[in-house]
UniProtKB/Swiss-Prot annotation:
In the N-terminal section; belongs to the N-acetylglucosamine-1-phosphate uridyltransferase family. One of its GO terms (biological process) is regulation of cell shape. This is Bifunctional protein GlmU. Acetyl-CoA binds at A380, N386, Y387, S405, A423, R440. It catalyses: alpha-D-glucosamine 1-phosphate + acetyl-CoA = N-acetyl-alpha-D-glucosamine 1-phosphate + CoA + H(+); N-acetyl-alpha-D-glucosamine 1-phosphate + UTP + H(+) = UDP-N-acetyl-alpha-D-glucosamine + diphosphate. Disulfide bonds: none annotated. Its cofactor is Mg(2+). The keyword Metal-binding applies. The lineage of its organism: Bacteria, Pseudomonadati, Pseudomonadota, Gammaproteobacteria, Enterobacterales. Residues 251-456 are annotated as: N-acetyltransferase. It comes from Salmonella agona (strain SL483). Its main location: cytoplasm. Gene3D superfamilies: Hexapeptide repeat proteins, Spore Coat Polysaccharide Biosynthesis Protein SpsA, Chain A. NCBIfam families: glmU, PRK09451.1. Catalyzes the last two sequential reactions in the de novo biosynthetic pathway for UDP-N-acetylglucosamine (UDP-GlcNAc). The C-terminal domain catalyzes the transfer of acetyl group from acetyl coenzyme A to glucosamine-1-phosphate (GlcN-1-P) to produce N-acetylglucosamine-1-phosphate (GlcNAc-1-P), which is converted into UDP-GlcNAc by the transfer of uridine 5-monophosphate (from uridine 5-triphosphate), a reaction catalyzed by the N-terminal domain.
């Protein structure tokens, strides 16, 4: 069916006392992203013309964290219930648009479920998302007559008979803007909590003869809210299990799906293998036949075909061409670039550095602010000294250079093609093509040398 224009209201004013945190509840993260951002993203994908965010506690921190100029920020100075929160947003509703109500602490709601709810909304009526629970205690119970939804009774206000009703309200609903404003204006706080319940609009709509269509989510976990860290941790595991399942079904080999975390977006080629305890953050692309060892962290990086990253390596904001090998225990920091066939071994760190085709840095090395050519050997213990205490400087190493172990290159410095730098050398001046450079303290031999003896 053809949907009306739609705006979304996200309720995010709660303090989250049971989180025991100075951070507003909706800013606590799931899969590396604030809970409320998951909800905002769902609203955006659904095609919301406007997203109204109702905030209260921690408003400044919310604005600093989300930094979204497309949000309409609506202050709820006093937390007097969900109906009161919607009343604060009501002046922004257009009469001819639909209004979808979501919650900033219900992060797993899916676009697919929301689209079904949107499609099911009757003309002039309400679309209501409900679930059935074995134990409905503490929730708002759905009342029906002859199968039709007639209202919602909060648990504290319900009779013993009503408390046995297993179908409960999730709080997510959609209605026309003009209708919603009219119903909101009629809400009262005559209940056990002394609050304005948004759920009371269901009875108001029924009294007007409007139809209420109840829709169930694909998974109950989509409507699970978060009130404490235990609940958040459970949703994290549900979310990660779902992501792992999608990857496995798309052909990615996760050696232990229960020990894999995706905290962003992952694009994979064919025959990718990922070992246990790997964390993917941000936007990551893995080419064909990539292998990621146990305990690695990959963030905002592109990994080319046939690359292998050995265990406990960290790759952040880096770009690897085909057939590169990394680690174990390597660290690629932002700006690291490896051309085809390059190798970075154990305890090697790169930052804003380019390692050419077939070049190798095998052990215990720091390469920062450096441009390194093709077929270069970087010996163990090599350091590019890029910082003078105030500014950073660049090291340039040409093709086919051999850098011996324990070499320091004091930037700015350039080493020409084919040059050889002897072990233990400190390079402070430019080196011409094909030169041999060495700087060592003369070796001294003392015959009959006696070691010092400790005093008794």
């Amino acid at each position: 069916m053809l949907n009306s224009a739609m705006s979304v209201v996200i309720l995010a004013a709660g303090k989250g006392t049971r989180m025991y945190s100075d951070i507003p509840k909706v800013l606590h993260t799931l899969a590396g992203k604030p809970m409320v951002q998951h909800v905002i993203d769902a609203a955006t994908k659904l095609g919301a013309a406007q997203v109204h965010l109702v905030y209260g506690h921690g408003g400044e921190l919310l604005k600093q964290t989300l930094k979204d100029d497309k949000l309409n920020w609506v202050l709820q100075a006093e937390q007097l219930g969900t109906g009161h929160a919607m009343q604060q947003a009501a002046p922004f509703f257009s009469d001819d648009e639909d209004i979808l109500m979501l919650y900033g602490d219900v992060p797993l709601i899916s676009v697919e479920t929301l689209q079904r709810l949107r499609d099911a909304k009757p003309q002039g009526g309400i679309g209501l998302l409900t679930v059935k629970l074995d134990d409905p205690s503490g929730y708002g119970h759905i009342t029906r007559e002859n199968g039709k939804v007639t209202g919602i009774v909060e648990h504290k206000d319900a009779t013993d008979e009503q408390r046995q009703i297993q179908e409960i309200n999730t709080g997510i609903l959609i209605a026309n803007g003009a209708d919603l404003k009219r119903w909101l204006s009629k809400l009262t706080n005559n209940n056990a909590q002394g609050e304005y319940y948004i759920t009371d609009i269901i009875a108001l709509a029924y009294q007007e003869g409007r139809e209420i269509a109840a829709v169930h989510p694909a998974r109950i976990s989509e409507t699970d809210g978060v009130n404490n860290r235990l609940q958040l941790s459970r949703l994290e595991r549900i979310y990660q299990a779902e992501q792992a399942e999608k990857l496995l079904l798309s052909g990615v080999m996760l050696r232990d799906p229960a020990r894999f975390d995706l905290r962003g977006t992952l694009h994979c080629g064919m025959d990718v293998e990922i070992d246990a305890n790997v964390i993917i953050e941000g936007y990551v692309t893995l080419g064909h036949r990539v292998k990621i060892g146990a305990g690695c962290i990959i963030k905002n990086s592109v990994i080319g075909d046939d690359c292998e990253i050995s265990p406990y390596s960290v790759v952040e904001d880096a770009h690897l061409e085909a057939a590169c090998t990394i680690g174990p225990f390597a660290r690629l920091r932002p700006g690291a670039e490896l051309l085809a066939g390059a190798h970075v071994g154990n305890f090697v760190e790169m930052k804003k550095a380019r390692l050419g085709k077939g070049s190798k840095a095998g052990h215990l090395t720091y390469l920062g602010d450096a441009e390194i050519g093709d077929n270069v050997n970087i010996g163990a213990g090599t350091i590019t000294c890029n910082y003078d205490g105030a500014n950073k400087f660049k090291t340039v190493i040409g093709d086919d250079v051999f850098v011996g172990s324990d070499t320091q290159l004091v930037a700015p410095v350039t080493v020409g093609k084919g040059a050889t730098i002897a072990a233990g050398t400190t390079v402070t001046r430019n080196v011409a093509d094909n030169e041999l450079v060495l700087s060592r303290v003369p070796q001294v031999h003392k015959q009959g040398w006696q070691r010092p003896v400790k005093k008794k």
